């Protein structure tokens, strides 16, 4: 898997809406029209489940070609899993007809399912391999966890909103992602009983990198996290643990994510 997506970090920046966030990236045309997009569900022909699945597969292919590969994602493994994960099963019913557009969508509780591009980018930057153990902070609807699970890794995911955690856990079980484990908790403290992790991914922006997450990384492990002020421009960081007390960080560009939610002290 590619260790870095260096083509994204350039001087000229374009503002793109991703994952309920603003992502500042390079000169690639990021507002590209994805053909006609998936048709409204009401307009789909009444046919068998197999035909319906094929229609979703075609929409996923269009999403991947025009919203992921065209924007610079190069990992064959990530591209393959983005073609497989049924995103329409992770959005509310009223948004199913928009499931394969390259946009974030509301999932309730003031949260969103991330834009497919940002999911692919962050997954690629984790640089995981089959058999790895990964911690996700911010389960949401479970889509990012499903993408990770398709890479044959063990996924531990934490969601602070109890209803979202319960719904995501049920959804992941129904789709048979048995290598996912959901916890309702404050993600700031990670999951110490299951540490260390080969990689950690955070899908909301704190104003600093939580120390517990750094300490729960294996030596050589990678943390991908947006950091910055609420409502302002943040940065997406890739942090590698080099030794017990040494870390190397690299910016992947400017972003704007929802704030990192904490339990009240």
Language-model-derived ranges and their functions:
Residues 9-14, 21-135, 146-147, 151, ...:
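Class I SAM-dependent transferase core
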Residues 1-5:
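Positively charged n-region of N-terminal signal peptides that target proteins for export
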Residues 127-248:
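Conserved nucleotide-cofactor-binding alpha/beta core module
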């Amino acid at each position: 898997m590619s260790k870095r997506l260096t083509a994204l970090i350039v001087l000229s920046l374009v503002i793109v809406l991703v994952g309920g966030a603003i992502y500042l990236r390079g000169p690639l045309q990021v507002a590209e029209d994805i053909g006609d997009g998936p048709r409204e569900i009401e307009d789909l022909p009444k046919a068998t489940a197999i035909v319906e699945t094929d229609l979703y597969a075609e929409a996923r292919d269009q999403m991947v070609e025009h919203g992921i590969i065209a924007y610079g994602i190069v990992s064959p493994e990530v591209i393959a899993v983005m073609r497989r994960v049924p995103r329409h099963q992770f959005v509310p019913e009223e948004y199913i007809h928009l499931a394969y557009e390259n946009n974030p969508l509301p999932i309730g509780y003031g949260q969103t399912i991330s834009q497919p591009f940002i999911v692919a980018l962050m997954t690629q930057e984790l640089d995981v391999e089959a058999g790895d153990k990964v911690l996700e902070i911010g389960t949401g609807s479970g889509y990012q966890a499903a993408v990770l699970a398709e890479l044959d890794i063990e996924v531990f995911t934490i969601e602070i909103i109890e209803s979202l955690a319960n719904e995501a856990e049920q959804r992941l079980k129904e789709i048979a992602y048995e290598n996912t484990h959901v916890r309702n908790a404050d993600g700031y403290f990670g999951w110490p009983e299951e540490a260390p992790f080969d990689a950690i991914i955070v899908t909301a922006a704190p104003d600093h990198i939580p120390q517990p997450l750094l300490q729960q990384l294996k030596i050589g492990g990678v943390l991908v996290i947006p950091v910055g002020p609420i409502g302002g421009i943040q940065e997406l960081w890739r942090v590698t643990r080099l030794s017990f007390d040494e870390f190397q960080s690299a910016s992947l560009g400017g972003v704007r994510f929802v704030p990192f939610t904490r339990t009240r002290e």
